[in-house]
Amino acid sequence: MNVFRPVALIPVYNHHQVIDELLDVLGSLDLPVILVDDGSNELCARSLDVSAASHRQASLVRLAKNGGKGAAVISGLYVADNMNFTHAIQIDADGQHDLAAVTDFLDQAHHN
């Protein structure tokens, strides 16, 4: 039987304002989350520390310097693989993605 262990991957660069809202919604879906801090400023970094600590499903990875969204996603995928997740869905930190569609994406990934 194939194991399906999805994770949400959120690259973050100085966009901490809606992270708690994203984590609340993804938590209601029982979806683990990897936040990748892509060299954010101190204010954002502190906010991410608090957010990750207050959401049990969230893990925080911090990159030493900004490498861009692609580098943050790749770093997050390596972390996801090391944590034995089988699938990742990337979600933008600014809240622009429709989180109502996440379950549809996960259902499609699980059945294909």
Predicted regions and their residues:
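Short, well-formed alpha-helical segments that are part of the catalytic scaffolds
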Residues: N14-S28
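Hydrophobic/aromatic residue at the end of a short beta strand that borders the catalytic acidic motif
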Residues: K69, G95-A101
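Short beta-strand-to-loop acidic/aromatic patch adjacent to the donor-nucleotide binding site
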Residues: F85-Q96
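Cell-envelope/extracellular polymer assembly enzymes that use nucleotide-activated donors
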Residues: R5-V7, P32
